[in-house]
């Protein structure tokens, strides 16, 4: 008989039913009660889990532990069945910012970075993380668990079904802040930037030799060639300012290479339908001004303005006059000119060579260095507003969580390491910037594919005429960038993020620090789950040959069904497989494989489109099968051939393809799939239909288009 135990209730400070979004959540366990076989966890006065505990008559021992280690609170409720199995099934209720995920790395698994677009039903998920309140509830290994999202209005509900000889429910409040050590992460005060950020930067194209004419030509090419595909930002990165940098006039009154002035440049960029983006930094190299206004700068032991490598004279962020005279005028004027994207450079040097290297100055004044540092960037944010995009550069900046929209996670030049070393930060803490991509380089397809599938910041940096060549395909098929959430709230390779606390005691920013993201890839598999109301599918990018066979269960897919596997870049259908598939060799032209994986159905079905590396994630709005017809709606780019890749099982005869708002240019079978090519002169939303004749006996009409698992036994 089930042993009923009432767990001790812990009184919360928040009033029942009140959930003040601006207030910090309590750093304490939930109230836990077990009555009549029903377990309820209540946090901030609201139930976050309500479930039933079943054991089939076996005696169940219940234990609870709530403890604090290194300021991080953990609460565990463990159910152990004596000679049988125990099952805990119920609902997790959280905010609309909650998502299903993994919170702890599994043992002996292939390293793989997971992301999701839309509510995720991946069978690897063992937890629900509520970003708005920074808590996570999970089930410990080795219990078998399925976490599935449900639709909700003002909250998000997930079903949680766990079974085993032992089931342990674990609750961790203030997870990123305390358990991950991000003390500045207060997500109840801000939301992550959701729109796609894709565009062009002048740095590797022109370095500091960029001219106004270069920007004008690039704007022309970008607006005609890449803007229709989602590249909307044009960023001037250095080269426009006068020297020495520091005084506002030298930032705002451009040098002779920009004779029309920054205001005109911004208007010209915007007139082409692009977002004007600009680079600045927080260095100060005007010695005459610094010596004339020493109170506006951090001072050394002799009382003179302190100097540091890269940063020059160190602006004192605790001095209101410094902010008023040197910082606010720059960003207020640029905002008024029309600039909407601000990259702020040299922030690592302000922290390391500036504030950390002059710790005694702040200590003597009773000031926290990190607070003063954060206030500098907060001032910039307050001036430009939250409608403008703010990028911190460069290196990991834990002090700026909640102030900036994105962080350039590594050194100059595109880096792969951050995709796996800071995967849990992306679009939760900030958006990761791996730095600019040169599509003229050999790894262009690999770089754009991974950047897009992980939901990272995507900026190109080539001479614009490169985009008039076929190399532009690597860029066109990667934008816009989907808003994704991490499938893991741990880092796949924790070697960097585990040392993030060292930022507080670092004195030099000359080169990457041990906690900055690496340039080398830290994983070879990158999985994106695309979840739409009409269909669920997976996209797997592979960049290494260390996985000659891939099991579908490794990808979190049910192992009891067949899947179609199609490679996007080579346009090759590998076939239909059960349990596993062999990806084969990576084509050296692309240096990446981009597999579209959909559950194989008994009727004609869409396998992919050619529009985007997400295999339809940005362009498909509906796909249905009914009355011997495959129909859907897609967003087309004007003048760009749009290809529907359709798998046709035996027993169906193609009749015709038709479209509303686009012309059907061709329809042909090649490589085991039908390719229906559409073209629209004006672009936009298009309806299409592919009609068949003949239906296998017994196949029901209106069969779902590959839905996520819906019950516990589906794995």
Region spans (language model):
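Active-site-proximal substrate-binding groove within the catalytic cores of carbohydrate-active enzymes
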Residues: 41, 198-201, 366-601
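Carbohydrate-interacting/catalytic domains
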Residues: 20-21, 32-33, 82-83, 117-123, ...
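Carbohydrate-recognition beta-sandwich/jelly-roll modules
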Residues: 25-232, 256, 341
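Sec-dependent N-terminal signal peptides
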Residues: 5-14
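Non-catalytic C-terminal accessory domains or segments of carbohydrate-active enzymes
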Residues: 25, 29-32, 36-76, 89, ...
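Aromatic- and carboxylate-enriched substrate-binding clefts and catalytic-loop regions
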Residues: 113-115, 120-123, 128, 228-444, ...
